[in-house]
Swiss-Prot record:
Main location: secreted
Gene Ontology annotations of biological process type: negative regulation of chemokine activity
Organism: Rhipicephalus pulchellus
Protein name according to UniProt: Evasin P672
InterPro entries per the UniProt record, alphabetical: EVA_Class_A
A UniProt-annotated Pfam family: EVA_Class_A
Record's keyword annotation contains Amino-acid biosynthesis: no
């Protein structure tokens, strides 16, 4: 008989524990968005990042100022490559409106925040 009472008591305590946990969760759901959880605070860091390069036969090229605009759907920032990255030194705005048109562009290497032309050419689009 004592064994049955002990099992009954454990079941009642377990049920009370489950009920208190469920009540705490439902109370937290009613809280305003000002009290955001840690999961929501870090959610934006894991979104895909998109950076805007010019396409070419030698790979992605940075603009003449060697700064690429990047976004992850919540924030924008400039990604600057000071030295060593490929860039295009010639900007032709009339060609940028037709993104699928291939044209000959002058390429160079980023140095000190500017594109230094090395007198080589590539097909750009």
């Amino acid at each position: 008989m004592a064994h049955k009472i002990a099992i009954g008591l454990v079941c009642v305590l377990y049920a009370l524990h489950i009920m208190s946990a469920v009540c705490e969760v439902s109370e937290q759901e009613g809280v305003g968005e000002d009290n955001a959880t840690e999961d929501e605070d870090y959610e934006d860091f894991f979104k895909p990042v998109t950076c805007y390069f010019a396409n070419s036969t030698v790979g992605p090229l940075r603009p003449p100022n060697c700064t690429v605009v990047c976004t992850n759907n919540t924030a924008w920032w400039n990604d600057t490559k000071s030295d060593g990255g490929h860039c295009y030194s010639e900007y032709r705005p009339e060609k940028r409106t037709h993104s699928r048109e291939i044209y000959n562009c002058t390429i160079g290497v980023c140095g000190n925040g500017t594109c230094i032309a090395n007198h080589t050419y590539a097909d750009c689009w």
